[in-house]
Amino acid sequence: MFGFFCSLVSSLSRWFLWRRLLLLLLLLLLNLPLQVKFAMLELHSFKCPAGEYWSKDVCCKNCSAGTFVKAPCEIPHTQGQCEKCHPGTFTEKDNYLDACILCSTCDKDQEMVADCSATSDRKCQCRTGLYYYDPKFPESCRPCTKCPQGIPVLQECNSTANTVCSSSVSNPRNRLFLLLSPLSVLIVSVVVFRIIRR
């Protein structure tokens, strides 16, 4: 009885092994045409001249900025059917996209400086009183720094740069000294001039 059981387990194991091998072989065979198709696409896409793209076994001319490919060409080296970008979408360059790109939206702490058009995205900047904290992330607006009382502002805050404060304190005595220094030089010069003329 034990021998029969071992024989049954052995034949079942072989059957499962063969079944797995056949399944793997079938998957490889099914995948082969797909790999050949990708290889052909890569090969042909390199043969299309600049400004053209590969579609349905032919090279087609790109659509111009502000449009997208509605239907590819059927005759080699011609342009397919291009359609103008719908409102709220754009393409900046000649392309072979099947849809235009959605326009950006300004964040709540930004204001629009240029609206989206068929050929350019919407341009936004930080609102008045805010500046871009990190140029790598233009959406990160921060409140402008206010210089402490008595410290002069060297550069006002704008949408791209924070306020720059002077490193020296603007003291009323310093201003008085700066005003009186040229005045005292003038008085001394007049006195010396009068003495010399006598």
Curated annotation (Swiss-Prot):
UniProt note on tissues of expression: Ubiquitous.
GO biological process annotation, one example: negative regulation of extrinsic apoptotic signaling pathway via death domain receptors
Record-linked Pfam families: TNFR_c6
PROSITE patterns for the chain: TNFR_NGFR_1, TNFR_NGFR_2
TNFR-Cys repeats: 47-82, 84-124, 125-165
Claim: Secreted is one of the keywords in the record: yes
Entry-listed glycosylation sites: N62, N158
Function: Receptor for the cytotoxic ligand TNFSF10/TRAIL. Lacks a cytoplasmic death domain and hence is not capable of inducing apoptosis. Protects cells against TRAIL mediated apoptosis possibly through ligand competition. Cannot induce the NF-kappa-B pathway.
Name the UniProt record assigns to this protein: Tumor necrosis factor receptor superfamily member 22
Organism: Mus musculus
Gene: Tnfrsf22
